[in-house]
Amino acid sequence: MERRAGSRLRAWMLLLLLCPVQGRQKDSGSKWKVFLDQINRALENYEPCSSQNCSCYHGVIEEDLTPFRGGISRKMMAEVVRRKLGTHYQIIKNRLFREDDCMFPSRCSGVEHFILEVIHRLPDMEMVINVRDYPQVPKWMEPTIPVFSFSKTSEYHDIMYPAWTFWEGGPAVWPLYPTGLGRWDLFREDLLRSAAQWPWEKKNSTAYFRGSRTSPERDPLILLSRKNPKLVDAEYTKNQAWKSMKDTLGKPAAKDVHLIDHCKYRYLFNFRGVAASFRFKHLFLCGSLVFHVGDEWVEFFYPQLKPWVHYIPVKTDLSNVQELLQFVKANDDIAQEIAKRGSQFIINHLQMDDITCYWENLLTDYSKFLSYNVTRRKDYYQIVPRRLKTEL
């Protein structure tokens, strides 16, 4: 009974957040008409997804597996393994086996955690899982071959899976995250506690970004911050590739800032790095308004996050960033509602159960396209569950 009442309350709150925004700001006027119209269209076209059986993301699985509807042959799989495009795994009689070679052991471990969570319900299969940053199957490649990657653009046929960072193996940032980002379930709790300490009205209204220069697409925001520090507080930090101040646009590197301390700010920026950015999902849980720059790189959950509904979309060259910041400052209640919708989506649809469920649905559907019986490779060793980690 309580669960039904809770579901009705959440549905009512969602309907309230999805109400059209036109005419609700006294001074919006024609100055902001373009943005207000985009928000209204986005809300009118938005269809909230179900929380049942992680069906929210089923369309992503379906689209990623479409190229393989003709079947995956033993010969095709042998070619993928031969080309070393990732780590080769086999699931046989509800046991997980792997070749010895893995470029990033902690990343493989993060992947294996989720497979082992559902392995007792999985049929026999084999697959190649890429734990590099970059996808491996460009669309011009013929024939299309099955490789699992955590992120891609529309130019690739890789099959997306939930990244290892939901458990472990994320980027190490010393001294904040010396063993890397991980344990999404624990991190969620930390971020939500910080968000409660920094409600919207207490947040600093200066836009905020801290990160390393993994992509020059971030440069315009750093330069804007130097020109107008009251509008934007954005600085480069060091990463493993840092050699001199040239790598931080001629200024000393800033100190790294814990993600929970980002919650002090009302407007947070997300950029792609080498591929999709791991910080994206974290920013929403601050209850802040996320400015998402560019839309080329995606992870499996991105397609259900909609521009103007859950975040503010920013052009890749940042040519519209100042106008967007002026808009949200002039329309604070609208900005807050977008932030709430973004936060609620991640809270409701990106729980650890959703990650595990996605892995199970993805591998189960994928296995149906294998046109042969998998034979265990004798030199592969069995992966067994490790002791549960209870700290980040």
From Swiss-Prot:
Region ranges (Interaction with the consensus sequence C-X-S-X-[PA]-C in peptide substrates): 103-107, 172-178
Record keywords, A-Z: Developmental protein, Disulfide bond, Endoplasmic reticulum, Gastrulation, Glycoprotein, Glycosyltransferase, Signal, Transferase
Motif Prevents secretion from ER, residue range(s) on this chain: 389-392
Claim: Manganese is one of the keywords in the record: no
Binding site for UDP-alpha-D-glucose: 177, 212, 218, 274-279
Tissues expressing this chain: Widely expressed in newborn and adult tissues (at protein level).
Disruption phenotype: Mutant embryos die at or before 9.5 dpc. At 7.0 to 7.5 dpc, they cannot be morphologically distinguished from wild-type littermates. At 8.0 dpc, mutant embryos exhibit an abnormally expanded neural plate that does not fold properly, absence of heart rudiments and posterior axis truncation. Defects are caused by a deficit of mesoderm caused by impaired gastrulation.
Top EC class for this record: transferase
Pathway the protein contributes to: Protein modification; protein glycosylation
MF term (GO), any: UDP-xylosyltransferase activity
Enzyme Commission code(s) on record: 2.4.1.376, 2.4.2.63
Glycan-linked positions: 53, 204, 373
Annotated catalysed reactions: L-seryl-[EGF-like domain protein] + UDP-alpha-D-xylose = 3-O-(beta-D-xylosyl)-L-seryl-[EGF-like domain protein] + UDP + H(+); L-seryl-[EGF-like domain protein] + UDP-alpha-D-glucose = 3-O-(beta-D-glucosyl)-L-seryl-[EGF-like domain protein] + UDP + H(+)
Main location: endoplasmic reticulum
Membrane-spanning parts: none
Pfam families: Glyco_transf_90 (PF05686)
Intracellular or extracellular location(s): Endoplasmic reticulum lumen
Site entry (Interaction with the consensus sequence C-X-S-X-[PA]-C in peptide substrates), positions: 132, 240
Signal peptide: 1-23
GO biological process: axial mesoderm development; circulatory system development; gastrulation; muscle tissue development; paraxial mesoderm development; positive regulation of Notch signaling pathway; protein O-linked glycosylation; protein O-linked glycosylation via serine
Domain of life of the organism encoding this protein: Eukaryota
Similarity comment: family membership: Belongs to the glycosyltransferase 90 family.
Task of the protein: Dual specificity glycosyltransferase that catalyzes the transfer of glucose and xylose from UDP-glucose and UDP-xylose, respectively, to a serine residue found in the consensus sequence of C-X-S-X-P-C. Specifically targets extracellular EGF repeats of protein such as CRB2, F7, F9 and NOTCH2. Acts as a positive regulator of Notch signaling by mediating O-glucosylation of Notch, leading to regulate muscle development. Notch glucosylation does not affect Notch ligand binding.
Name by which UniProt lists this protein: Protein O-glucosyltransferase 1
Originating species: Mus musculus
